[in-house]
Amino acid sequence: MAQLAHMVYFTLKDRTPANTEALVAACRKYLNGHPGTVYFGAGTVVPDLDRPVNVRDFDVALQVVFESRAAHDAYQTAPRHLQFIEENKPNWAQVRVFDADVSA
């Protein structure tokens, strides 16, 4: 069975280092450790990776790999996930979500 990779790229309204680090901290607080998570990572764009193919129009990246589609679907309605959205959405200029079936 394929795992589901949930990748989210946030562009902030206020793109200061303090705000980007605050969003990374919120990702770690609210989005890590959900049932069915096999990988979690959150961080900021790498400043010196600027080849022509690099997309750099985001501030914070979130990657969560779930063991199944069912685990992903449960995460979407989990209270901690919804609280993360409620608390952080006011500073989002854009959010892009990429979901993919993946396997090793």
Sequence positions of predicted segments:
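Short S/T/G/P-rich N-terminal loop/turn motif that feeds into the first structured element of a domain
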Residues: 1-59, 63, 67-74, 100-104
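C-terminal structural segments of small proteins and small subunits
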Residues: 69-95
